[in-house]
């Protein structure tokens, strides 16, 4: 069939636009912009790392400062959105599409993204406003209007509109439904049709259950989100990190080889899908952007509600996000997938969360997939309340 004669549907237009936006424009904006901010700030993210940790611990906090949540709760609220399925499923997709070298470019994007987050979240404190209930709020929709002026309000409205369709919570629910279907619904033949596929009713009911659980948290506002995130984030990172260390310890002999492969493949582009160097770089940058959100503006909403009068202090706290999210959690996932060798195995060629599940099954037999399921539930839940 001649694809040139196929009608240009809305889905095709959306895909063409997405492929273009997530190509060279994204590379220039994220890496180029991040490099500019890094040099312009005279390498603030790296020189003031110790000071940022002191701020996070509350050394300079004043309970009388304006805001709704403390520095730690603000960072956890931001991390609840960033440390999600992008760290588990997104890394697996990056390795499948761009090869091991994509991880290297995720690191590059995270390093320069620290400066981007520093400036973005400093602006969130410098130019913030109040919502209809009188609570202090921040984010691009506020500092565009407060900083640039009311004539730029259409840009703030556009940000909100495109953010709504930016797929952020969709990926979380999609991957969570996928692993729940594979591990529970299909084996128990719950809501399964004659072709052994989960029915729309089963997926819909699971979606309703997720919506109810998330609503209980987000209806309490930024304060409840901050409190839940402050308890959930340390637990899920510790659980996921502990499981990962067990897997890496049992495959310790393969870890040095996996690290070497990341650096060598970063410049050769020998991807699983047969990609080239440009595909490796763009894949790494895309997944890093989705994972740590540096430059996307969403993180500024959480940090904009922090209790502080010093914009730079919150910027220093915010820049820890890409380091925790990409340089630590994403790297752990990548090393698990590479050291266990599941990314090279043939079969159904699963990607996303199912590929990571195979790595957990191989690294921790029997219990591995169920431990990952708990992690996925926590990561997805935290991300969806963070995006709210």
What does each of the following model-derived ranges do?
Residues 43-70, 93-103, 107, 115-149, ...:
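Flexible loop linkers connecting adjacent transmembrane helices
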Residues 64-97, 123-145, 158-161, 276-323:
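Alpha-helical membrane segments and immediately flanking helix-loop junctions
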Residues 27-32, 78, 107, 156-160, ...:
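Transmembrane alpha-helical segments of multi-pass small-molecule transport proteins
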Residues 120-128, 132, 243-261, 269, ...:
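Extracellular/periplasmic helix-exit of transmembrane alpha-helices
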Residues 1-85, 95-102, 113, 249:
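N-terminal alpha-helical transmembrane segments of multi-pass membrane transport
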Residues 97, 106-110, 114-129, 133-191, ...:
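Hydrophobic transmembrane alpha-helices that form the core helical bundles
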Residues 29-36, 40-53, 177-180, 201-250, ...:
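Membrane-interface loop-to-helix entry segments
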């Amino acid at each position: 069939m001649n694809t040139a004669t196929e009608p240009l549907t809305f889905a095709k237009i959306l895909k063409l636009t997405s492929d273009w936006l997530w190509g060279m424009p994204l590379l220039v904006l994220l890496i180029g912009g991040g490099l500019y901010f890094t040099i312009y700030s005279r390498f603030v993210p790296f020189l003031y790392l110790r000071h940022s940790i002191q701020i996070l611990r509350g050394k300079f906090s004043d309970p009388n400062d304006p805001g709704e949540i403390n520095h730690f709760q603000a960072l956890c609220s931001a991390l609840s959105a960033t440390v999600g399925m992008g760290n588990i499923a997104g890394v697996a997709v990056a390795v499948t599409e761009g090869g091991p070298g994509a991880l290297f470019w995720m690191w590059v994007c995270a390093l320069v993204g620290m400066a981007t987050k520093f400036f973005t979240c400093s602006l969130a404190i410098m130019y913030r406003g109040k919502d209809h209930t009188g609570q202090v709020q921040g984010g691009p929709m506020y500092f565009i209007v407060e900083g640039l002026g009311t004539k730029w309000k259409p840009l703030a409205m556009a940000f909100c509109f495109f953010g709504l369709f930016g797929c952020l919570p969709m990926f979380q629910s999609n991957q969570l439904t996928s692993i729940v279907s594979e591990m529970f619904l299909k084996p128990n033949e719950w809501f399964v049709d004659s072709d052994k596929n989960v029915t729309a009713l089963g997926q819909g009911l699971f979606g309703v259950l997720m919506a109810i659980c998330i609503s209980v948290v987000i209806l309490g506002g930024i304060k409840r989100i901050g409190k839940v995130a402050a308890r959930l984030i340390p637990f899920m990172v510790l659980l996921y990190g502990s499981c990962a260390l067990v897997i890496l310890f049992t495959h310790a002999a393969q870890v040095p080889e996996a690290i070497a492969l990341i650096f060598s493949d970063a410049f050769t582009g020998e991807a699983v899908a047969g990609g080239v160097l440009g595909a490796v770089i763009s894949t790494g940058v895309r997944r890093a952007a989705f994972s740590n959100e540096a430059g996307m503006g969403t993180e500024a909403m959480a940090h904009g509600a922090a209790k502080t009068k010093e914009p730079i202090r919150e910027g220093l706290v915010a820049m820890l996000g890409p380091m925790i999210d990409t340089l630590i959690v994403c790297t752990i996932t990548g090393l698990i997938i590479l050291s266990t060798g599941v990314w090279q195995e043939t079969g159904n060629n699963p990607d996303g969360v199912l590929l990571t599940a195979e790595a957990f099954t191989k690294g921790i037999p029997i219990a591995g997939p169920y431990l990952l399921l708990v992690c996925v539930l926590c990561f997805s839940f935290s991300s969806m309340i963070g995006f709210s």
